[in-house]
Amino acid sequence: MSLEENKAIVRRLNEALNKKDLAILDELTTPDYVDHTNQLRGQEDVRKFYTRVFKDFPVWHRIIEDFIAEGDKVWVRFKVTGTAPSGKKIELTTVSILRIVNGKAVEGWTVPKVTGEFYEKLL
């Protein structure tokens, strides 16, 4: 796949997640997708992760600010905004690297890791 096709896959994935459409995972990730940052293995783990994010932040949105593609990897810088049920607002920047093979994401890494104590403070 071309670099532009790989970027288009990441763009489609982001657009679907912004709509809370988790069905896109079946189309654009492999069944054994690995999220190295959050130690997720498989589409079901990723689905559970985003289900929690969407529950904790009913208003959640990612904007792509930068894209770089090289070989089978796409680097993307996101501006993430959200509002917790408490009304507390968040805004942070993350950088993700996704490896794309045959039109599907097979693994990814994200910085910063937004889990644990830091995640709880956001709520």
Region annotations inferred by a language model:
Residues 1-123:
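C-terminal and inter-domain tail/linker signature
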